[in-house]
């Protein structure tokens, strides 16, 4: 497949644009995760970036992508409310994989936000969405602009939540190509990859956490809970970056 140009794709009538992406995804569905990364690096335009929350399975995508592009910018949007274990995990993986880590934060400090707005995460869906906009979405948009990212790799998987169940390998999001190399992996494949390459889950995985974000909106998994119920009090699954 020839190098994809977003401008050319956008010039197509909507039906043809959808069909073109569907055809590409049909081919990508048949490729391994490693080959999807290779295809993306060879065929998608401009600066590639990789995002990571340094969550439970973060080591998989970080290792998978940086094996093929060691200097790819790895974007972390740091809310200032991550678990201590997460900050240590970030340090460990950054050193182990020699990551080109790029950290972006809200323009207001956590303390200033609390003084101005109170604890937004305790203010229902509207408060959580405002919190995410300030601490996740705006810093991410600034990161993409600063780094001039045109191709975005991320480690989402369909079996993580209902909101991700139908995501394609390749999509166009806000004028940027977004490629999800392990979108169709299950927990067994994640485990096998980590074992094969001497990598670890996030340290809180052993304490019963299936998904890890901020300290105030993350819960341990309990019997009967869906994975998405462990985040944001079950009110929503996404932090705004992948909606």
From Swiss-Prot:
Broad class of the protein's primary localization: cytoplasm
Enzyme superclass (EC): oxidoreductase
DNA damage keyword on record: no
Gene Ontology MF terms: phosphoadenylyl-sulfate reductase (thioredoxin) activity
GO biological process: hydrogen sulfide biosynthetic process; sulfate assimilation, phosphoadenylyl sulfate reduction by phosphoadenylyl-sulfate reductase (thioredoxin)
Compartments it resides in: Cytoplasm
Record key words, sorted: Cytoplasm, Oxidoreductase
EC number from the UniProt entry: 1.8.4.8
Superkingdom of source: Bacteria
UniProt keyword Methyltransferase, yes or no: no
Coiled coil: none
PANTHER family xrefs: PHOSPHOADENOSINE PHOSPHOSULFATE REDUCTASE
NCBIfam families in alphabetical order: cysH, PAPS_reductase, PRK02090.1
Protein's UniProt name: Phosphoadenosine 5'-phosphosulfate reductase
């Amino acid at each position: 497949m020839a190098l994809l140009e977003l401008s050319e794709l956008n010039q197509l009538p909507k039906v043809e644009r959808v069909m073109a992406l569907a055809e590409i995804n049909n081919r990508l569905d048949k490729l391994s995760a490693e080959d999807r990364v290779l295809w993306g690096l060879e065929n998608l335009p401009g600066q590639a970036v990789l995002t990571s929350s340094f969550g439970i399975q973060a080591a998989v995508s970080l290792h998978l992508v940086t094996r093929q592009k060691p200097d790819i910018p790895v974007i972390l949007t740091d809310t200032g409310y991550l678990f201590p274990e997460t900050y240590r995990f970030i340090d460990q993986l950054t050193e182990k994989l020699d990551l080109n880590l790029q950290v972006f934060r809200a323009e207001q400090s956590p303390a200033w936000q609390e003084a101005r707005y109170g604890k937004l995460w305790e203010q229902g869906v509207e408060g959580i969405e405002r919190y995410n906009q300030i601490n996740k979405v705006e810093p991410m948009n600034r990161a993409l602009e600063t780094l001039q990212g045109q191709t975005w790799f991320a480690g989402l998987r369909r079996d993580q939540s209902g909101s991700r169940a139908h995501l394609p390998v390749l999509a166009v999001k806000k004028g940027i190509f977004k490629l999800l190399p392990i979108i169709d992996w299950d927990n067994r494949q994640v485990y096998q990859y980590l074992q094969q390459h001497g990598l670890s889950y996030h340290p809180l995985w052993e304490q019963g956490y299936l998904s890890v974000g901020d300290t105030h909106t993350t819960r341990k998994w309990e019997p009967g809970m869906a994975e998405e119920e462990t985040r944001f009090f079950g009110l929503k699954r996404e932090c705004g970056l992948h909606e």
